C-alpha cells in the first residue's frame, strides 16, 4: 500500500490537525507521512492580516506542493481556504465541526461587557473588531498575531486586557484555561467555515477521494457550504469584516450572516433558511449586497483598513 503524504503548515494547531487526520487514516490501515510547508501567512507576522489581505495566504504553498505531486492530501483550517479553489483542486472532505464560536479570554475580566472603559483588546480580525466596537465603542482594539501560545502569553504578560480567539483551536490544543466566555453568535458572528477542517486533493483523484470519504460529516459539509457560498457571493476572504453562522435543524440549513464596517458603526445582518446550502448562501449574500454590503466592502478595500498599530 502506497504511503499517503499529508501537507500541512507547521504551526502547533496545524500540526495537531494534520496529526489528527493522520491518526484516523492509520486506524484504517494506511501508512501516512507528514510534510510541513511554510506559507506566506506564516512568514508575515508583523502586519495585521487585514493589511496583508491576500486570499490563500495560508494555503497557496501547500497547494503548490499538492499540484507538484509532493503531497497527496492537504489539511487546512477551512476558514483559511479560499471559497473558490484554484484550478486543479477539489475539496474531498469537510470534517466533523468543533464549536465554531469565538471566545473571550482574560486574566482579570469575565466578559466583554465587564471590561473597563478604554480596555485593550487583542485581535487582528476586522470581523471581530467590528462586532466588539458595535457593542463597546470605548474599547481599544490592537493587532494580535502569532500562534496560540504566543497570543495567550501576551495576554498573561499584560499586553492586553483581553483577547478574542476561536474556541475550536484552543479546545484542540487543550488551552481553554483563560476562556471566560463563549461568545454567542448573536453578539459575535463567527468566520465562515470556522471550526471545521477542509481536506483538499488534486482534482479528479478518485483514489484519494474514496480513501478520505469517511471523514466527511454531513452537517459540517452543509453548514460550511452555505457559509462559504455566502462569502463567495460577497467576494470576501477570511480577512474581511464578514461573518457567517449556519446550523442544520429539521432538515433545513439556517444561515445568519453579517457584513460590517470595521469601526462597528454599521452592521448588516441577514438570516434565512433553505434545503440547498449553496443556493441559500448565495441568496443571503445577494440580499446583503442589495442592502448596502457592496458599499461597505468597497470602502474597506479602498481604505486598506486595518487594526491600529501595536501598543
UniProtKB/Swiss-Prot annotation:
The keyword Nucleus does not apply. Its cofactor is dipyrromethane. Pathway: Porphyrin-containing compound metabolism; protoporphyrin-IX biosynthesis; coproporphyrinogen-III from 5-aminolevulinate: step 2/4. Signal peptide: none annotated. SUPFAM superfamilies: Periplasmic binding protein-like II, Porphobilinogen deaminase (hydroxymethylbilane synthase), C-terminal domain. Its EC number is 2.5.1.61. Keywords: Porphyrin biosynthesis, Transferase. It catalyses: 4 porphobilinogen + H2O = hydroxymethylbilane + 4 NH4(+). GO terms for biological process: protoporphyrinogen IX biosynthetic process. It comes from the Bacteria. GO terms for cellular component: cytoplasm. It holds the Pfam family Porphobil_deam. Monomer. The porphobilinogen subunits are added to the dipyrromethane group. Tetrapolymerization of the monopyrrole PBG into the hydroxymethylbilane pre-uroporphyrinogen in several discrete steps. This is Porphobilinogen deaminase. The gene is hemC.
Amino acid at each position: 500500500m502506497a504511503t499517503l503524504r499529508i501537507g500541512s503548515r507547521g504551526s502547533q494547531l496545524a500540526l495537531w490537525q494534520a496529526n489528527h487526520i493522520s491518526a484516523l487514516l492509520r486506524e484504517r490501515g494506511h501508512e501516512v507521512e507528514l510534510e510541513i510547508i511554510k506559507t506566506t501567512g506564516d512568514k508575515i507576522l508583523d502586519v495585521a492580516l487585514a493589511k496583508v489581505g491576500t486570499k490563500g495566504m495560508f494555503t497557496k504553498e501547500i497547494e503548490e506542493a499538492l499540484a507538484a505531486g509532493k503531497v497527496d492530501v492537504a489539511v487546512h483550517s477551512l476558514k483559511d481556504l479560499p471559497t473558490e479553489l484554484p484550478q486543479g483542486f477539489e475539496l474531498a472532505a469537510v470534517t466533523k465541526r468543533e464549536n465554531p464560536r469565538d471566545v473571550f479570554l482574560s486574566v482579570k475580566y469575565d466578559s466583554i461587557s465587564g471590561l473597563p472603559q478604554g480596555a485593550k483588546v487583542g485581535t487582528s480580525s476586522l470581523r471581530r473588531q467590528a462586532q466588539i466596537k458595535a457593542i463597546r465603542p470605548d474599547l481599544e482594539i490592537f493587532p494580535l498575531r502569532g500562534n496560540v501560545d504566543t497570543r495567550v502569553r501576551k495576554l498573561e504578560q499584560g499586553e492586553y486586557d483581553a483577547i478574542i480567539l476561536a474556541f475550536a483551536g484552543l479546545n484542540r490544543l487543550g488551552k481553554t484555561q483563560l476562556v471566560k466566555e463563549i461568545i454567542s453568535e448573536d453578539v459575535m458572528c463567527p468566520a465562515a467555515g470556522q471550526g471545521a477542517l477542509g481536506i483538499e486533493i488534486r482534482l479528479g483523484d478518485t483514489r484519494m477521494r474514496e480513501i478520505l470519504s469517511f471523514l466527511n460529516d454531513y452537517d459540517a459539509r452543509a453548514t460550511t457550504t452555505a457559509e462559504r457560498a455566502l462569502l463567495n457571493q460577497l467576494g470576501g476572504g477570511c480577512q474581511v469584516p464578514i461573518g457567517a453562522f449556519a446550523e442544520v435543524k429539521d432538515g433545513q440549513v439556517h444561515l445568519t450572516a453579517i457584513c460590517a464596517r470595521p469601526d462597528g458603526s454599521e452592521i448588516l445582518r441577514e438570516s434565512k433558511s433553505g434545503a440547498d446550502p449553496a443556493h441559500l448562501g448565495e441568496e443571503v449574500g445577494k440580499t446583503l449586497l442589495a442592502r448596502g454590503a457592496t458599499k461597505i466592502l468597497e470602502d474597506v478595500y479602498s481604505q486598506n483598513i486595518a487594526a491600529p498599530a501595536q501598543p
